[in-house]
Regions:
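RNA-contacting regions in translation and RNA-metabolism proteins
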Residues: 1-43, 51-76
Length: 76
Protein backbone atom coordinates (compact mmCIF):
# COMPACT_ATOMS: atom_id res chain seq x y z
CA UNK A 1 0.00 0.00 0.00
CA UNK A 2 2.92 2.32 0.66
CA UNK A 3 4.06 1.79 -2.93
CA UNK A 4 0.60 2.68 -4.25
CA UNK A 5 0.47 5.89 -2.23
CA UNK A 6 4.00 6.83 -3.31
CA UNK A 7 3.10 6.24 -6.97
CA UNK A 8 -0.05 8.37 -6.72
CA UNK A 9 1.69 11.29 -5.02
CA UNK A 10 4.72 11.18 -7.35
CA UNK A 11 2.34 11.32 -10.32
CA UNK A 12 0.84 14.58 -9.04
CA UNK A 13 3.96 16.62 -8.29
CA UNK A 14 6.67 18.38 -10.31
CA UNK A 15 9.51 16.97 -8.18
CA UNK A 16 8.74 13.27 -7.70
CA UNK A 17 12.24 12.55 -6.37
CA UNK A 18 11.47 14.72 -3.32
CA UNK A 19 8.41 12.71 -2.29
CA UNK A 20 8.74 10.46 0.73
CA UNK A 21 6.14 8.30 2.40
CA UNK A 22 6.76 6.89 5.86
CA UNK A 23 4.62 4.32 7.57
CA UNK A 24 3.90 4.00 11.27
CA UNK A 25 1.45 1.97 13.31
CA UNK A 26 -0.72 3.38 16.09
CA UNK A 27 -3.75 1.84 17.81
CA UNK A 28 -4.19 -0.89 15.20
CA UNK A 29 -4.10 1.62 12.37
CA UNK A 30 -1.40 2.27 9.78
CA UNK A 31 -0.62 5.95 9.34
CA UNK A 32 1.13 7.09 6.17
CA UNK A 33 2.99 10.38 6.44
CA UNK A 34 3.54 12.07 3.07
CA UNK A 35 6.27 14.65 2.58
CA UNK A 36 6.80 16.59 -0.65
CA UNK A 37 8.70 19.67 -1.80
CA UNK A 38 7.25 22.91 -0.45
CA UNK A 39 6.02 23.99 -3.89
CA UNK A 40 4.34 20.63 -4.52
CA UNK A 41 2.27 20.39 -1.34
CA UNK A 42 -0.53 22.41 -2.90
CA UNK A 43 -0.74 19.92 -5.76
CA UNK A 44 -1.08 17.04 -3.33
CA UNK A 45 -3.69 18.82 -1.21
CA UNK A 46 -5.66 20.39 -4.06
CA UNK A 47 -8.27 23.14 -3.94
CA UNK A 48 -10.12 23.00 -0.65
CA UNK A 49 -8.39 19.67 0.06
CA UNK A 50 -10.18 17.80 -2.72
CA UNK A 51 -7.21 15.81 -4.01
CA UNK A 52 -5.97 14.67 -0.61
CA UNK A 53 -9.55 13.74 0.31
CA UNK A 54 -9.79 11.49 -2.75
CA UNK A 55 -6.38 9.95 -2.00
CA UNK A 56 -7.60 9.15 1.52
CA UNK A 57 -10.82 7.60 0.18
CA UNK A 58 -8.87 5.44 -2.26
CA UNK A 59 -6.39 4.28 0.38
CA UNK A 60 -9.19 3.44 2.83
CA UNK A 61 -10.99 1.43 0.14
CA UNK A 62 -7.85 -0.60 -0.59
CA UNK A 63 -7.20 -1.10 3.12
CA UNK A 64 -10.77 -2.17 3.78
CA UNK A 65 -10.47 -4.92 1.19
CA UNK A 66 -7.44 -6.18 3.12
CA UNK A 67 -9.17 -5.83 6.48
CA UNK A 68 -6.94 -2.99 7.68
CA UNK A 69 -7.35 0.62 8.78
CA UNK A 70 -5.24 3.41 7.32
CA UNK A 71 -4.98 7.17 7.36
CA UNK A 72 -2.95 9.56 5.24
CA UNK A 73 -1.35 12.70 6.66
CA UNK A 74 0.40 15.45 4.70
CA UNK A 75 3.41 16.59 6.72
CA UNK A 76 5.06 20.02 6.78
Amino acid sequence: MKELLTYIVQSLVDNPDQVSVTERKADGETIYEVRAAEGDKGKVIGRQGRIVKQIRILMRAVAQRKGKKVSVEIMD
